[in-house]
Amino acid sequence: MRDISWLTSRPIAHRGYHDKSRGCLENSQSAVQAAVDKGFAIEVDLQQSADDVPIVFHDDTLDRLTFESGPVRQRSAAELTGIALRGTDDRLWTLDDLLDQVDGKAGLCIEIKSRFGRTPERAFIASIAASLARYSGPVAVKSFDPEMLALMREAAPDIPRGALGDGARDLKEWGRASRV
């Protein structure tokens, strides 16, 4: 497993260094660049597109941060990357786009979003693992879904993984934590 000391050695900009009042939204190119410029590590979220491409976006639906609506998972990466974020010059982007922009200059803590109760998509996890394999900077992944982390362990055992929880419901879910 890789060195994880970077996770506690400097601040981590949650969803990038964003500030809505200056037109810099969470998980955007601008927020990520601002975090890099400040010397912070960066936490971002990944949603699955209809064609299994990791999209840098927090919400399950497009409604809150774009002028579009509906689930992210029902659109292709080509469709999603054409969607502008409200009030900005930024658009939705892929994990590969993010990795190209950051270019190893910052640690990345990546949250893999989940469809709890449904079979996790191996192709989606494989795509994430393949992209992260080429990243030259430090990286770790996390998820609320133990199945996603178990699949990441299979696909990329050297990438550090972290389990997230938000209540008693998770105690039952994380009973299988040895697979993570």
Predicted regions and their residues:
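Phosphate-group recognition and catalysis centered on beta-loop-alpha active-site segments
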Residues: 1-180
